[in-house]
Amino acid sequence: MTDKTEKVAVDPETVFKRPRECDSPSYQKRQRMALLARKQGAGDSLIAGSAMSKAKKLMTGHAIPPSQLDSQIDDFTGFSKDRMMQKPGSNAPVGGNVTSSFSGDDLECRETASSPKSQREINADIKRKLVKELRCVGQKYEKIFEMLEGVQGPTAVRKRFFESIIKEAARCMRRDFVKHLKKKLKRMI
């Protein structure tokens, strides 16, 4: 007999692995990390001092002192503390005093203009909400009809949208709602 077979006959536990034991490095690494997590305590995280957490702090502004944050904002806008316009790379003033006359409406208009949604995105969002409302049992249909009024685009797009919602309502066994949708579709055409 060979040495291996004698060893199996004498001590079978050395050959067969236990279900929780594994020799792979990833298993051992997970075990060590779990042990470290228990040692650190429940409130501490494993990435507390890592570069990732520092980057998150920089993004949120928690790691930047307020004095540096103010100077960074001033550098970004091009204004100094005395409201003189400056060149972005230098501290020399360019012109006289600059005043701003923005109202709340101007800011709202700029926000909507900076991130406009396309008709497809708006319609896809409405469709997702409509399907969610359709699947809720016992819902009133007024809310769904209000959402359907918000569909944007030409009549062909609206017609396709109504047809897809009719199919979804039929699939959800909403026969009375399908009748109402078909009436609205006929009025629209």
Swiss-Prot record:
Basic and acidic residues composition bias: residue spans: 1-23
Domain of life: Eukaryota
Listed name of the protein: Cancer/testis antigen family 45 member A1
Lineage per the UniProt record: Eukaryota, Metazoa, Chordata, Craniata, Vertebrata
Source species: Homo sapiens
GO (cellular component) term, any one: nucleus
Family in the record: Belongs to the CT45 family.
Cellular location(s): Nucleus
InterPro entries: INT_SG_DDX_CT_C, Integrator_subunit6
Alphabetic keyword roster: Nucleus
PANTHER family, A to Z: DEAD/H BOX POLYPEPTIDE 26/DICE1-RELATED, INTEGRATOR COMPLEX SUBUNIT 6
